[in-house]
């Protein structure tokens, strides 16, 4: 289905394109996989569908667990930790990084929230290697190296 020109710019939001799609296609569950995330697997997709189909979640998206590392702003200020009380890594709960590569949602949730996720949200945890999102030349080189190593 062609998108209207206003949804085809460098600044168009994916959520707006998904809402446009939902107005023209009948579906219960939408799977949105970004082309820039080539390592998302059918297992990840199926897990997300099952999470939403079971009605335990209204939507779900792919994440990777990341252990705590000290983060700094460009102004050289610690982000979310106290420089005078640096925690030990093993004492800090891990965080989950949104992959940007896979989203599963119901039509109702999408149309109500106007967002790809909302309501009761679930995480589809994927290994770091499948969480690569190609947004730079370095990301592309990394993806090519991974493909070369498994070919």
Sequence positions of predicted segments:
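Short, well-ordered alpha-helices that flank and scaffold nucleotide-derived cofactor binding pockets
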Residues: 23, 50, 145-149
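Short acidic donor-binding/metal-coordinating loop in glycosyltransferase active sites
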Residues: 4-5, 35-37
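Conserved core of the sugar-phosphate nucleotidyltransferase
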Residues: 10-20, 38-127
